[in-house]
Design a protein with these regions (language model features):
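C-terminal output helix
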Residues: 24, 41-50, 54
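The C-terminal output helix
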Residues: 51-66
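Terminal helix-turn-helix DNA-binding modules in bacterial transcription factors
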Residues: 122-160, 182
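Alpha4 helix (beta4-alpha4-beta5 surface) of REC/receiver domains from two-component response regulators
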Residues: 9, 20-35, 48, 152
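Basic/polar phosphate-binding segments, predominantly the helix-turn-helix DNA-binding elements
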Residues: 102-131, 156-176
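Basic, amphipathic alpha-helical hairpins
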Residues: 88-100, 120, 124, 141-149, ...
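Short amphipathic alpha-helix used as the core "switch/output" element in two-component signaling
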Residues: 1-9, 131-134
Length: 182
């Protein structure tokens, strides 16, 4: 089933069928269909439904916030939510690794790099590197608030070069780590 495959679970499924009995429609939705259209159908109605599905997906991607991954029960299917949570888990588990890349993330969740990029973008409108950066910078802000020194924080979130870390921190938070401390 498409909705139970990590490679395709994010794809919208619309069933076009001549079976209009309520039991058939229920079965279609139980199988994971996002919409069920009985033939013959009105072309204008079909176009409206497709436009609405597309705009709903675009709106969800525009509103997407990495902090919402753990609170996104209604936005994603259970399968897609688990995929995003797995990504977050792997990133957090490798936070200190300065050589951690999207390729390593893909390998850890058993997907090809291109499939990971395509799926992640389809769900969030962003790239996995954005999630890696967000996770690192959010953790860095927490550690700075806990009074760790900037060079310690840099190492703890996967930056070997404190200057590069400070630049990335400022770009993400709008202020340098030393200003953020105050």
């Amino acid at each position: 089933m498409l909705k139970n495959d990590i490679n395709t679970s994010h794809i919208t499924i619309i069933l076009f069928t001549a079976k209009g009995a309520p039991d058939s429609i229920i079965d279609g939705y139980d199988c994971g269909a996002d919409d069920y259209i009985v033939k013959p159908f009105d072309t204008d109605l079909l176009l409206k439904k497709v436009k609405n599905i597309i705009s709903t997906g675009e709106n969800a991607r525009k509103k997407f916030n990495f902090a919402d991954i753990e609170h996104s029960k209604n936005i994603y299917s259970d399968f897609d939510k688990k995929f995003l949570e797995d990504c977050v888990f792997v990133i957090k588990d490798n936070l200190q690794d300065s050589s951690f890349t999207v390729e390593i993330l893909a390998e850890n969740i058993n997907l090809h790099r291109k499939t990971l990029l395509r799926k992640f973008n389809a769900l969030t409108g962003k790239s996995p590197i954005d999630l890696i950066r967000h996770t690192r910078m959010s953790k860095a802000a927490e550690l700075i608030k806990e009074k760790y020194r900037v060079n310690e924080v840099a190492l703890m979130v996967g930056y070997e070069d404190t200057g590069r870390f400070s630049k990335a921190f400022k770009q993400f938070h709008g202020v340098s780590p030393s200003v953020y401390i105050q």
